[in-house]
Amino acid sequence: MQRRQIGKLQVSLTGLGCNNFGWRIDEAQSRRVIDAALEAGINLFDTADIYDKGHSEEFLGRALGKRRREIVVATKFGMKFDETRHGAKPEYLRQAAEDSLRRLGTDYIDLYQLHQPDPETPIADTLGALEELKQAGKVREIGCSNFSAAQIREAGGKFASVQNQYSLFHREPEAEVLPECGRQHIAFLPYFPLANGLLTGKYRQGQPLPKGSRGDAGWGPKMFSEENLEKVERLIQFAEERGHTLLELAFSWLAAKPVVASVIAGATTPEQVRANASAAGWKLTSDDLPKIDILMA
């Protein structure tokens, strides 16, 4: 699989989001998903301390075992873990890092990310503590998530990566965040690349939403509107006319962005992992991209 850069780290073009571990799938199934990812050439595993209150990190650490040196472990801190554990104050993040290291069963974190901005803590204080962790060898690179372009600028180029929501149906980062990443040579990691399942191909115009699916959830009617489903049909036709699938279009469109280092996608089965791992290989041309924009208009 193609490799790209996050600072000094070489990462696979598709990364495995570990948010389902413990919440939607148990440890045995999580291990099967991890094994399938490694077999498919994925080396970036993205988790967070709040994913099932630390169980995601624990499952990942135990599954990797002696394979730890082969892969890039990315985790996050800062979202509310409980009433006392949250935010980006130096004293808290130091403890959060130690807790993540223990749960992951490792002595270093490849990419340590601030999960969201903390308005109560000056970013300079947070960055100072993160730099201490780097100097101590406990963290190799630092990143952020859910940051605006202004907040990225305020960090003064200290972050190696930015992880925000981005897909064909959520293009807000294009206005300011992606250009800022380009200016500062910061890697961008899109999450929710399949727009909450809308770009999987499971949801079709004129067909009922599958029971128990994301489309059947409370926010389904808005996301899975007739307008969006019509766009999905146009995208499917575009992909199939060129011998590809909607899934491949969703991943490859993101991979065509120069600042994108790895597309972070969750999975609950080995089959999903294998499909995601091969989905970013379609080389979209300079003629394809504006045509896709027209389809989404």
Give the ranges of each region predicted by the language model.
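Acidic-and-aromatic substrate-binding clefts and catalytic sites of carbohydrate-active enzymes
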Residues: 22-26, 48-57, 81, 118-122, ...
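N-terminal small/glycine-rich loop or linker at the start of catalytic domains
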Residues: 6-22, 74-85, 108, 113
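Active-site groove signature of glycoside hydrolases
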Residues: 101-120
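Alpha-helix N-cap and loop-to-helix initiation/capping positions
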Residues: 25, 29, 55, 59, ...
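N-terminal binding-site loop/beta-alpha segment at the start of enzyme catalytic domains
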Residues: 1-71
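Structural motif
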Residues: 36, 40, 103-104, 137, ...
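Short, acidic/polar
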Residues: 25-37, 88-104, 148, 152-153
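Beta/alpha (TIM)-barrel catalytic core signal, keyed to glycine-rich beta->alpha loops juxtaposed to Asp/Glu
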Residues: 117-297
